[in-house]
């Protein structure tokens, strides 16, 4: 009985102990491959040791560097698979992962993120997040000290994964200070393998290493977390440095005589146990590596163990190196941090600690030191520059753009010389010149698009393209807006709209465009950047880039141009019923806008997503998109010029200038000399009222069959030919009127109303309440039959033509003619 009791008691204890333990599943997010013999290799090895010792499950994701979408998907997949302990070695995206962890702060999910100590949020609302700061400053100082001391060439190098001009260079400075502390006369060559955050490219790093070796460097340091740089040194007969914490001598023997060792297995085992046992400490301290453990510390700080093969060190230097290492091991008690106490920081930081040293935070936020023995090597020396545009595309765009500019200049000369031609005056020559000028600006912007990207061309081509389209579409919009206002005037009220009343509207649209462009340039950080071509690791090209604020400004700019296109579509729809061909540009405008919209919404928007999804940092999609934009701009502008000006040139070529005609034929009739032969015999100079009555009676006696034989019939030329009972009598202008920019003064018939020839380019509509004109009431089917009085021979002799359109009301014939 006692045995049974004790057995039950033991089982209860075991079950109780098991119930108090939490389940833990690890998900490891690696920046590169776990076979890199570097940081990723060591953390993956530590993961396997945790699995082995604690009997838990884990998953691993690799090659997440520079790819936030992949990081996001890896985190989601990890949580969906039940992982509650996520470990990240992606130092470049530590902020992104820290912010992402906030989405799960109310869940039992724990995080260990490799980053910097200043990345914890303030106020700190992430209790289950530990930030692992691998502080290798002293390790890099130690390796720089040895490299400079035993260098045979007096030159050592360093390859940084960060941008030398803009980014902090903490490890670079630590390596350099160690070098000058052992040999002040050393020459320090620095090069960056950073091409737009493409800083983990092993082939590029290998190539840069060979470049530094060719310049006499025999030791190369780097903050890259793999050994590709050291392999290049070894392949060229040099000595490798172990810079990642891996014990390279186990694999490469004497080829890596100097390194340091970091063991992460015990650290991960200890932290995982706190999750399983429920002893996780919220807002825990940051783990900082050092040469020795701090006395009395309770954290899990890995110890840096220096590894030195003294066979490669001359005896005269061995004691000096041993003394330096002993100082580093006792740095906590003696406060020996030589990388923080160099005189080079005197001109950088005014505020220091009482001992004359800067703080660790100040050192972490320091740029590359300025010293005479530091030489920066341009990383483009290893690469071949390749233009993003092929020569054939560049020559084609350049040739077509220059030819189109030449055509536009000829068109401007043509319009200026023949500005009094009827078809040109009806279309407002000044606005035609503005349209062509806008096209010239567009073609100039296209030429800049085909040139290599620089800071100036990146800014200038967008300015030219946007301003060109604003002048082109704005002038077209405002010019036809006036036509709509004048012809959509059923009550014939007087309206005077001159060019000078329209110019401010065009200028206002242009000002809005300039303001958006200024916002884009001021906030967008527009610049040219070098990017490695994805198809070749030894070629680069320049592309234009901007930040997120610049992208927002570009979206606003595109929306602004879209509104102009919609406005132009609306105006072209409203003027489609204008029955005078010289004023009706609805068809060419609609076609031009359709082509532009097709290019914008069909081609560009379809190409852009597929290009961006292929590679966010690759220059090929960017260059392809820019090429498409450039070709579309040239094509749409050239076609628009042909549509808007082709019919005008054809009319002048076939019909002549028409300087003595008040208005042209409507879209449904034409005046032909053959049609008017019967009227010419009986028509007079238009000033004799009786002769007009005779012509009227003669025309009235024509039978229906004769009317049908006429090849052309006159349709009432009104404002909009919607009603068959509305018509307007047009008085022909005098010669003085021909100096006006528009050849069609539309006036009421009321006696005493005349045309003011002093107001250039002015339309006038007068309300006439004394007369109401209708069609002939004798036959309901022939209300729109009008008689024409036109003497072709007299038009050639007189200075102005007399044109009358007569109507009949209440069976009374009334002929109105203008003397």
Swiss-Prot record:
GO molecular-function term, one example from the UniProt record: G protein-coupled receptor activity
Protein's recorded name: Metabotropic glutamate receptor-like protein O
Taxonomic superkingdom: Eukaryota
Ranges of compositional bias, category Acidic residues: 769-798
Ranges in the topological domain labelled Extracellular: 20-394, 450-457, 525-550, 609-624
Composition bias type Basic and acidic residues, residue spans: 748-768
Polar residues compositional bias, start-end: 726-739
Transmembrane segments: 395-415, 429-449, 458-478, 504-524, 551-571, 588-608, 625-645
Protein location: Membrane
PANTHER family the UniProt entry points to: METABOTROPIC GLUTAMATE RECEPTOR-LIKE PROTEIN A-RELATED, METABOTROPIC GLUTAMATE RECEPTOR-LIKE PROTEIN C-RELATED-RELATED
CDD domains in the record: 7tmC_GABA-B-like
Entry keywords, A to Z: G-protein coupled receptor, Glycoprotein, Membrane, Receptor, Signal, Transducer, Transmembrane, Transmembrane helix
GO CC annotations on file: plasma membrane
Organism expressing this protein natively: Dictyostelium discoideum
Ranges of Basic residues composition bias in the record: 695-712
């Amino acid at each position: 009985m006692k045995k049974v009791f004790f057995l039950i008691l033991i089982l209860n204890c075991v079950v109780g102990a098991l119930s108090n333990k939490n389940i833990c599943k690890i998900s490891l997010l690696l920046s590169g491959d776990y076979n890199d013999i570097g940081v990723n290799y060591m953390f993956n090895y530590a993961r396997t040791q945790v699995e082995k010792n604690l009997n838990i499950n884990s998953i691993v994701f690799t090659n997440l560097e520079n790819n936030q979408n992949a990081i996001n998907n890896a985190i989601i997949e990890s949580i969906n698979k039940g992982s509650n302990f996520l470990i990240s070695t992606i130092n470049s995206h530590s902020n992104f992962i820290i912010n992402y962890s906030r989405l799960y702060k109310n869940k039992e999910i724990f995080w260990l993120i490799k980053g910097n100590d200043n990345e914890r949020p303030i106020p700190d609302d992430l209790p289950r997040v530990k930030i692992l700061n691998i502080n290798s400053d002293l390790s890099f100082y130690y390796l720089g000290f040895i490299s400079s001391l035993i260098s045979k060439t007096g030159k050592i190098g360093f390859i940084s994964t960060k941008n030398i001009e803009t980014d902090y260079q903490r490890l670079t400075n630590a390596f350099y200070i160690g070098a000058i502390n052992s040999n002040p006369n050393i020459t320090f060559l620095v090069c960056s393998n950073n091409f737009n955050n493409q800083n983990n490219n092993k082939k590029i790093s290998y190539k840069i290493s060979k470049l530094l070796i060719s310049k006499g460097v025999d030791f190369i340091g780097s903050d890259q977390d793999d050994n590709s740089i050291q392999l290049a040194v070894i392949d060229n007969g040099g000595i490798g440095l172990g810079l990642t914490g891996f014990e390279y001598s186990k694999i490469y023997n004497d080829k890596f005589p100097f390194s340091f060792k970091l063991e992460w297995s015990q650290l991960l085992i200890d932290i995982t146990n706190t999750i399983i046992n429920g002893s996780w400490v919220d807002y825990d301290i940051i783990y900082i590596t050092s040469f020795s453990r701090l006395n009395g510390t309770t954290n899990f700080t890995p110890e840096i163990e220096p590894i030195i093969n003294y066979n490669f060190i001359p005896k005269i230097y061995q004691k000096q190196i041993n003394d330096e290492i002993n100082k580093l091991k006792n740095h906590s008690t003696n406060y020996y941090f030589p990388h923080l106490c160099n005189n080079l920081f005197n001109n950088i930081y005014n505020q220091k600690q009482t001992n004359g040293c800067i703080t660790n935070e100040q050192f972490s936020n320091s740029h590359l030191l300025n010293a005479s023995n530091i030489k920066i090597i341009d990383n483009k020396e290893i690469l071949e520059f390749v233009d993003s545009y092929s020569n054939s595309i560049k020559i084609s765009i350049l040739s077509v753009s220059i030819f189109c500019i030449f055509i536009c200049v000829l068109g401007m000369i043509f319009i200026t010389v023949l500005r009094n031609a009827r078809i040109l005056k009806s279309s407002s020559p000044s606005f035609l010149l503005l349209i062509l000028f806008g096209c010239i600006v567009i073609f100039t912007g296209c030429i800049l698009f085909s040139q290599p990207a620089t800071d100036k061309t990146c800014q200038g081509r967008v300015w030219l393209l946007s301003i060109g389209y604003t002048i082109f579409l704005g002038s077209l919009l405002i010019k036809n807006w006036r036509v709509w206002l004048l012809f959509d005037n059923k009550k014939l009220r007087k309206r005077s709209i001159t060019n000078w009343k329209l110019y401010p509207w065009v200028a206002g649209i242009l000002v809005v465009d300039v303001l958006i462009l200024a916002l884009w340039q001021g906030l967008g950080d527009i610049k040219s950047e070098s990017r490695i071509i994805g198809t070749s690791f030894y070629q680069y090209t320049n592309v234009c880039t901007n930040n997120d604020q610049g992208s927002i400004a570009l979206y606003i700019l595109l929306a602004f141009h879209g509104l102009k296109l919609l406005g132009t579509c609306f105006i072209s729809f409203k003027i489609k019923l204008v029955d005078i061909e010289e004023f009706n540009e609805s068809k060419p405008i609609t076609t031009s806008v359709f082509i532009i919209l097709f290019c914008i919404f069909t081609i560009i928007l379809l190409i852009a997503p597929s290009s961006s999804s292929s590679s966010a940092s690759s220059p090929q999609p960017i260059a392809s998109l820019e090429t498409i934009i450039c070709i579309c701009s040239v094509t749409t502008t050239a076609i628009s010029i042909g549509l808007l000006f082709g019919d005008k040139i054809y009319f002048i070529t076939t019909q002549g200038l028409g300087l003595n005609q008040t208005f042209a034929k409507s879209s449904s009739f034409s005046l032909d000399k053959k049609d008017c032969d019967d009227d010419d015999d009986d028509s007079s100079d238009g000033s004799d009222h009786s002769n007009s009555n005779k012509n009227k009676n003669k025309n009235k006696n024509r039978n229906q069959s004769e009317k049908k034989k006429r090849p052309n019939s006159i349709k009432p030329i009104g404002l909009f030919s919607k009603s068959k009972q509305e018509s307007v009598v047009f008085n022909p202008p005098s010669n003085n009127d021909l100096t006006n920019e528009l050849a069609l003064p539309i006036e009421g018939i009321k006696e005493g109303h005349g045309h003011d020839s002093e107001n250039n380019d002015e339309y006038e509509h007068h309300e006439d309440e004394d007369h109401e004109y209708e069609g002939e009431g004798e036959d309901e089917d022939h209300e729109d039959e009008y008689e024409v009085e036109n003497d072709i021979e007299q038009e050639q002799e007189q200075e102005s033509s007399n044109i009358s359109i007569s109507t009949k009301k209440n069976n009374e014939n009334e002929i109105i003619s203008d003397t």
